[in-house]
C-alpha cells in the first residue's frame, strides 16, 4: 500500500514542496527568509481580512473607522498594529532575502529571480496603497506626492495621474480604488509566490558554496522544518515585542492627524522601508530624472545577472566582492537615513553621493571586482 502523501494528487504537491523536497545539506540561516515571507504573507492576509470587516473606504469615515477598530472592536488594536508592523517585518525579511540572493549568486536562476523582482514590486505597490488607507495627513500627502510623480512622463503624464486619482485631486475615488487594489493584490502575490516556488523547485535550491549539491541532498522535513521553526519563533518574538511595547515606533506621528488637503505637513516622507528609494528620487533635481532613478533603483536587480563577471557563483570565496557587498548595505542604510531627513544641506549632498555610490557599486565596481578575482585565481 502506497503512502497517501505520495499518491494523493493534492497532498503529493505539498509533499514534494515541503516534506520530501531534496535540499542541499549546507544551507545556512539565510535560507530561512523564504519561509518567513510566506508566514508574513499569510499573517498580513488574515489580519487584513479582519480589518477590512470594520474599515470603510470613504474620505469622511476612513480615519474614524480606523479609530473605531482600535477603540471599540474586540482586540482591534492588536489586529491593526500586527498588520502595520507585520508590513515592516515583511520588508525586513524581503530585503534580507534579496540580499542573500545577491550575495550567494541565486540570481543565476533567471526565472525564479525575475518572478522575485515582480513579487518585490507588487509588495511595494500593495504596501504603498495600504499606507494611504488610514487617511491621515501622511497618507493623503504621501499619495499625492508619489502619484504626482507619474506626471513627469511626457505627453500622457497629467492624464495618467488624473486617471489614477479618478478626478483632479486625491479624493474619495482614489481611496476607494486603493482599498480595492490593496485587498486583491495579496492574493496575486500568493499566486506569484507559488510560481516562484515552482521555478525554484525545477532547479533546486542554491547553497553557500555555489556549487551543485545534487549528489548529497537531504529531505526538507525534519531537518529544515525544525530550522525554519526557530526562525519563525524569532520573527514572532520580534513582532510581538514591537506590537505590545512600541507599536508606533516605525509609524509617523502626522498620520494621527486626519487628512487635510489645505495643510501640508513640514516633511512628507513614506514608510521607512521606502526611504532608500525616496532618497534616490530626491537626490536628482530634475523631476523626470528622479522618477527614472527611482524606478531603476529597483529594476537594476533585473540586470545584475548580466553584470556577473566572476567564474564563481557566490561571494563566499571572493573577498573583494564581499567588501563591495557590505559597502552597498552600508550605502542603503545611509540612503534610508537620508530619506527621512529634511531637504537641506548637508543631507542633499550626502544623498547625492550615496545615490552615485549605489549605482556605481552595482554597475561598475562589482563587475570589475569579478574580473580582478578571476585574474587572481590564475596566480
Curated annotation (Swiss-Prot):
Cellular compartments per GO CC: mitochondrial inner membrane; respiratory chain complex III
Cofactor note: Binds 2 heme b groups non-covalently.
Protein's cellular compartments: Mitochondrion inner membrane
CDD domains: cytochrome_b_C (cd00290), Cytochrome_b_N (cd00284)
Coiled-coil residue spans: none
Transmembrane segments: 33-53, 77-98, 113-133, 178-198, 226-246, 288-308, 320-340, 347-367
PROSITE patterns: CYTB_CTER, CYTB_NTER
Record key words, sorted: Electron transport, Heme, Iron, Membrane, Metal-binding, Mitochondrion, Mitochondrion inner membrane, Respiratory chain, Transmembrane, Transmembrane helix, Transport, Ubiquinone
Gene3D superfamilies reported in the protein's UniProt record: Cytochrome Bc1 Complex, Chain C (1.20.810.10)
Main subcellular location: mitochondrion
Membrane topology designation: Multi-pass membrane protein
UniProt-listed Pfam families: Cytochrom_B_C, Cytochrome_B
Keyword Electron transport annotated: yes
GO molecular function, one term: ubiquinol-cytochrome-c reductase activity
Binding site for heme b b562: 83, 182
Binding locations of heme b b566: 97, 196
Listed GO biological process terms: mitochondrial electron transport, ubiquinol to cytochrome c
Additional remark text: Heme 1 (or BL or b562) is low-potential and absorbs at about 562 nm, and heme 2 (or BH or b566) is high-potential and absorbs at about 566 nm.
Subunit structure: The cytochrome bc1 complex contains 11 subunits: 3 respiratory subunits (MT-CYB, CYC1 and UQCRFS1), 2 core proteins (UQCRC1 and UQCRC2) and 6 low-molecular weight proteins (UQCRH/QCR6, UQCRB/QCR7, UQCRQ/QCR8, UQCR10/QCR9, UQCR11/QCR10 and a cleavage product of UQCRFS1). This cytochrome bc1 complex then forms a dimer.
Function recorded in the entry: Component of the ubiquinol-cytochrome c reductase complex (complex III or cytochrome b-c1 complex) that is part of the mitochondrial respiratory chain. The b-c1 complex mediates electron transfer from ubiquinol to cytochrome c. Contributes to the generation of a proton gradient across the mitochondrial membrane that is then used for ATP synthesis.
Protein name, as recorded: Cytochrome b
Gene: MT-CYB
Amino acid at each position: 500500500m502506497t503512502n497517501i502523501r505520495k499518491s494523493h494528487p493534492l497532498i503529493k504537491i505539498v509533499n514534494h514542496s515541503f516534506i520530501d523536497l531534496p535540499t542541499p545539506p549546507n544551507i545556512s540561516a539565510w535560507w530561512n527568509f523564504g519561509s518567513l515571507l510566506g508566514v508574513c504573507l499569510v499573517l498580513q492576509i488574515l489580519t487584513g481580512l479582519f480589518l477590512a470587516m470594520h474599515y470603510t473606504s470613504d474620505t469622511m469615515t476612513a480615519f474614524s473607522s480606523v479609530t473605531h477598530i482600535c477603540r471599540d472592536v474586540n482586540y482591534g488594536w492588536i489586529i491593526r498594529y500586527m498588520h502595520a508592523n507585520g508590513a515592516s517585518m515583511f520588508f525586513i525579511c524581503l530585503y534580507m532575502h534579496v540580499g542573500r540572493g545577491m550575495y550567494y549568486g541565486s540570481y543565476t536562476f533567471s526565472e525564479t529571480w525575475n518572478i522575485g523582482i515582480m513579487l518585490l514590486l507588487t509588495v511595494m505597490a500593495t504596501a504603498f496603497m495600504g499606507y494611504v488607507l488610514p487617511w491621515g495627513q501622511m497618507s493623503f500627502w504621501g499619495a499625492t506626492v508619489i502619484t504626482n510623480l507619474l506626471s513627469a512622463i511626457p505627453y500622457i503624464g497629467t492624464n495618467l495621474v488624473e486617471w489614477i486619482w479618478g478626478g483632479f485631486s486625491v479624493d474619495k475615488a482614489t481611496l476607494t480604488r486603493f482599498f480595492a487594489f490593496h485587498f486583491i493584490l495579496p492574493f496575486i502575490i500568493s499566486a506569484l509566490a507559488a510560481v516562484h516556488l515552482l521555478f525554484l523547485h525545477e532547479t533546486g535550491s542554491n547553497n553557500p558554496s555555489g556549487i551543485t549539491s545534487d549528489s548529497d541532498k537531504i529531505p526538507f522535513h525534519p531537518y529544515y522544518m525544525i530550522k525554519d521553526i526557530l526562525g519563525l519563533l524569532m520573527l514572532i518574538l520580534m513582532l510581538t515585542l514591537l506590537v505590545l511595547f512600541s507599536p508606533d515606533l516605525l509609524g509617523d506621528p502626522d498620520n494621527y492627524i486626519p487628512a487635510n488637503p489645505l495643510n501640508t505637513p513640514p516633511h512628507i516622507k513614506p514608510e521607512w522601508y521606502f526611504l532608500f528609494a525616496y532618497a534616490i528620487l530626491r537626490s536628482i533635481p530634475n523631476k523626470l530624472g528622479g522618477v527614472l532613478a527611482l524606478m531603476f533603483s529597483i529594476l537594476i536587480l533585473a540586470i545584475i545577472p548580466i553584470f556577473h563577471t566572476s567564474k564563481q557563483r557566490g561571494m563566499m570565496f571572493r573577498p573583494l566582492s564581499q567588501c563591495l557587498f557590505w559597502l552597498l548595505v552600508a550605502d542603503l542604510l545611509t540612503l534610508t537615513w537620508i530619506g527621512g531627513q529634511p531637504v537641506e544641506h548637508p543631507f542633499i549632498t550626502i544623498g547625492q553621493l550615496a545615490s552615485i555610490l549605489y549605482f556605481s557599486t552595482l554597475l561598475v565596481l562589482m563587475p570589475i571586482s569579478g574580473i580582478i578575482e578571476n585574474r587572481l585565481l590564475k596566480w
